[in-house]
């Protein structure tokens, strides 16, 4: 029914991702469709049932094989286009913020690249967990989108000083968690602005360059990076 194009898909076809499928393969890590057949011994799924899948490959074909354990049954009311773009970004943000970041209600989260897929999911998950969210994006339009989906404050790093704006928005304390799917030139000023015993979550490097972060900050601020 539908397949999404995620940043890992671009890396996979360039052989730059940690998962390197054997050639030849059909790209498309995440998709939604209807079960056409079941393997021997498969339980919990039925032929004709709608599912969303995240098997890593196959989504850009007319048919795909997927392990049953990686198929999520869908209600008929869930649009295929939404379902095909749901699992990866929300699972990524939930794992980063809740499992690795140990986010607690009342903490402040800074989301870099906040208007993208994982960024918008991070805003929603952090708000659902009771956090205050600062969304950083590259335009006023993107910042407005972030506010519409729940961000408490925004930072436009195309014309605002990252460290100064973060300091102003946190009364000089800094964010407890920084969620970074972007990397690049704004990673270091954000990293240097983190709160005492904060957590820096490295989710990806969508900007291209992998930043070299000052490790001394981890000792002086007792912060954790993941």
Language-model-detected regions and their locations in the chain:
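Glycine-rich beta-strand-centered segment in the early N-terminal region that forms part
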Residues: 1-4, 16-58
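Conserved beta-strand positions in the Rossmann-like core of class I SAM-dependent methyltransferases
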Residues: 36, 134, 201
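N-terminal Rossmann-like NAD(P) cofactor-binding module of classical short-chain dehydrogenase/reductase
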Residues: 52, 110, 155, 178-179
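Glycine-rich phosphate-binding loop and adjacent beta-alpha segment
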Residues: 137, 146, 182-221, 225
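NAD(P)H dinucleotide-binding glycine-rich loop of Rossmann-like/cofactor-binding domains
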Residues: 11, 20-24, 50-115, 148
């Amino acid at each position: 029914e539908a397949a999404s194009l995620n940043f890992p898909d671009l890396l996979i076809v360039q052989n730059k991702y940690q998962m390197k499928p054997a050639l030849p393969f059909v790209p498309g890590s995440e998709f939604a469709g209807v079960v056409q057949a079941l393997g021997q011994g498969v339980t919990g799924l039925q032929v004709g049932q709608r599912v969303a899948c995240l098997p890593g490959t196959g989504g850009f074909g007319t048919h795909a094989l997927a392990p049953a354990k990686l198929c999520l049954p869908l209600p008929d009311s869930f649009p295929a286009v939404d379902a095909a773009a749901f699992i990866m970004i929300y699972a990524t943000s939930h794992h980063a913020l809740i499992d690795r970041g140990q986010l607690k209600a009342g903490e402040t989260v800074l989301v870099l690249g906040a208007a993208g897929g994982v960024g918008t999911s991070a805003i929603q998950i952090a708000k659902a967990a009771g956090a205050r969210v600062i969304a950083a994006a590259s335009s006023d339009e993107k910042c407005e989108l972030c506010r519409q989906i729940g961000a408490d404050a925004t930072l436009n790093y195309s014309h605002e000083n990252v460290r100064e704006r973060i300091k102003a928005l946190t009364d000089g304390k800094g964010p407890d968690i920084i969620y970074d799917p972007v990397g690049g030139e704004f990673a270091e000023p954000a990293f240097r602005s983190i709160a005492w015993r904060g957590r820096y979550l490295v989710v990806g490097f969508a900007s291209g360059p992998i930043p070299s972060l000052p490790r001394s900050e981890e000792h002086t601020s007792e912060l954790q990076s993941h």
